[in-house]
């Protein structure tokens, strides 16, 4: 739904609606006025539209801080997907009609492609970027183009070697990690392809804009290794402007973490993102995320506070089968959020900022995860004494979830399904879906899965949303995974001709985390690898689950020890 009620639509939904409208309007230029010649240059349409969502809405609503949203949403998605061996490049060949649907990978042709355009915009400057686009549209109006046509216009406008630089980035899959080794007045920089999980050897190199915190004699790292002279501890990718991960040596890392509260917001997000994904890849121990997150518990910027909370959430996979350790993580999560929640309370105050509204949601989510009795009882009171439509929209999903999770009754479930079916509000429907899929009750999970196949209750286009919410809930993960395999013929019959056909596979791969689940995934989906629309998603799914299983085996003991020590 692209209609917003000023009184009822939550801030997050208003932002989403605005970006969707901006995305589609931008296709008047990127897609209609100038159109890609063939599907391999789909990014000329979608990567640009992705970037323009944020350019346009940031200009219209600067108080929304859209580039912080870009950093936490698009950049995070691009980093995680692009770190898997076998991922497609932004510009990808199409050898079979059924492969066209696979090009629409939201993390690559949308998020990564958009990020690469942000990178070149920052590299050449706004004036040259605008001039290059103006020339591109005038020269190719009502014509078909290839990627090189755009890069040539940007190169002419900027006087920089954009063609060679950007062709490497869009044609080469994956991303680099830049390792920084500092001495007193110099730093050795080296690059290699960044992987999470099993991978083939790679000698890939990128021309990497460094965007450093000080002038360097090398602005673009083109080679495997180089030395630069520095005046102070070196920080790279300032403003989160380029598509790479930075691994600092211990002394520089300690310096940045010690001073993280003094950094600009996007730099804080960059450090948190790098720390999280480096831990996933085994460059750092996942236990290091705990003190990093706790150091930011008084952060007032919602995106940074949310990223720190996300670092704590990363640790949940390590306590999946350990009740005592899970209780420890719950207590730590509650303590992380307590001061912020006590500051903001349950109810919005006059003149409250968007940041405070979003911080309240994040803090309340962690307080509920911690099973704070006072918070859960207040959630029950508010649920019992209000119509769903009257609950505050920013925290309504949390209130419903807390009640389903801790105070579920058969009548409650029936009433929520009835409300879902009868409400005209897409926002309320989504909040109910989040709430119902938080259940601990296997029978409720089974009822949800049965209703997914009933289009009179859940529309087919919403089916994967219910599924992903359910499979990411610890108590229902196995139930949802069994259902997917048992009902694959229905998935195939319902979505086989749609570009969302592989969504169920991709969502399952984000949640499965045990060796047995990995074996089951392989056994069930590997025979389908000859289906063009599914092949890449299946292979990437195996890599993703394998990496998660390996990560848990490698870091679990250290994470459990860190949890115990922190308490």
Each model region followed by its residue ranges:
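Residues that act as N-cap/strand-start positions at coil-to-secondary-structure junctions
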Residues: 172-174, 204, 222
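Hydrophobic alpha-helical and helix-loop surface patches within well-folded domains
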Residues: 1-200, 314, 321-344, 358, ...
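Short polybasic amphipathic segments
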Residues: 207-212
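Long, ordered, helix-rich scaffold segments
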Residues: 75-76, 80, 112-113, 183, ...
């Amino acid at each position: 739904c692209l209609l917003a009620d000023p009184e009822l639509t939550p801030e997050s939904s208003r932002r989403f609606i605005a970006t969707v409208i901006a995305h589609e309007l931008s296709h008047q230029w990127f897609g209609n006025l100038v159109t890609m010649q063939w599907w391999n240059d789909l990014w000329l349409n979608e990567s640009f539209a992705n970037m323009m969502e944020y350019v346009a809405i940031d200009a219209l609503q600067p108080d929304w801080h859209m580039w912080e949203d870009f950093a936490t949403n698009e950049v995070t998605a691009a980093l995680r997907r692009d770190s898997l061996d076998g991922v497609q490049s932004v510009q990808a060949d199409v050898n079979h009609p059924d492969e066209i649907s696979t090009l629409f990978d939201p993390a690559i042709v949308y998020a990564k492609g958009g990020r690469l355009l942000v990178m070149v915009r920052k590299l050449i400057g706004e004036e040259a970027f605008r001039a290059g686009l103006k020339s591109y549209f005038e020269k190719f109006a009502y014509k078909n183009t290839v990627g090189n046509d755009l890069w040539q216009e940007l190169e002419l406008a900027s006087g920089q070697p954009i063609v060679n630089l950007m062709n490497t980035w869009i044609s080469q899959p994956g991303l680099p990690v830049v390792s920084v080794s500092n001495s007193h007045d110099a730093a050795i920089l080296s690059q290699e392809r960044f992987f999470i999980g099993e991978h083939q050897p790679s000698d890939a190199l990128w021309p990497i804009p460094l965007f450093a915190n000080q002038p360097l004699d090398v602005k673009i790292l083109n080679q495997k290794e180089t030395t630069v002279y520095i005046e102070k501890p070196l920080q790279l990718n300032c403003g989160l402007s380029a598509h790479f991960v930075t691994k600092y040596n211990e002394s520089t890392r300690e310096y940045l973490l010690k001073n993280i509260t003094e950094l600009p917001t996007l730099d804080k997000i960059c450090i948190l993102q790098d720390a999280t994904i480096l831990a996933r890849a085994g460059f750092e121990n996942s236990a290091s995320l705990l003190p990093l997150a706790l150091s930011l518990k008084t952060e007032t910027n919602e995106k940074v506070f949310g990223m720190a909370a996300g670092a704590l959430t990363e640790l949940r996979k390590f306590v999946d089968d350990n009740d005592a350790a899970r209780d420890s993580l719950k207590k730590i999560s509650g303590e992380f959020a307590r001061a912020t929640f006590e500051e903001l309370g349950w109810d919005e105050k006059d003149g409250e900022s968007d940041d405070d509204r979003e911080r309240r949601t994040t803090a309340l989510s962690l307080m509920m995860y911690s099973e704070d009795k006072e918070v859960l009882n207040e959630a029950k009171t508010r649920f019992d004494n209000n119509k769903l439509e009257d609950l505050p929209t920013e925290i309504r999903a949390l209130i419903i979830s807390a009640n389903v999770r801790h105070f579920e009754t058969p009548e409650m479930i029936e009433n929520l399904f009835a409300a879902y079916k009868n409400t005209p509000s897409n926002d309320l429907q989504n909040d109910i879906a989040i709430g119902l899929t938080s259940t601990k009750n296997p029978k409720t999970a089974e009822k949800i899965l049965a209703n997914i196949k009933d289009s009179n209750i859940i529309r087919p286009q919403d089916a994967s949303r219910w599924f992903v919410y359910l499979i990411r809930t610890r108590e229902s993960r196995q139930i949802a995974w069994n259902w997917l395999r048992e009902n694959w013929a229905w998935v195939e019959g319902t979505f086989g001709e749609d570009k969302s056909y592989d969504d169920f596979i991709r969502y399952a791969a984000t949640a499965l985390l045990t060796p047995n689940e990995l074996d089951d995934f392989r056994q069930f989906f590997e025979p389908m690898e000859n289906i063009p629309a599914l092949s890449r998603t299946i292979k990437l799914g195996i890599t993703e689950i394998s990496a998660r299983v390996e990560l848990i085996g490698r870091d679990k003991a250290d994470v459990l020890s860190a949890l115990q020590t922190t308490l």
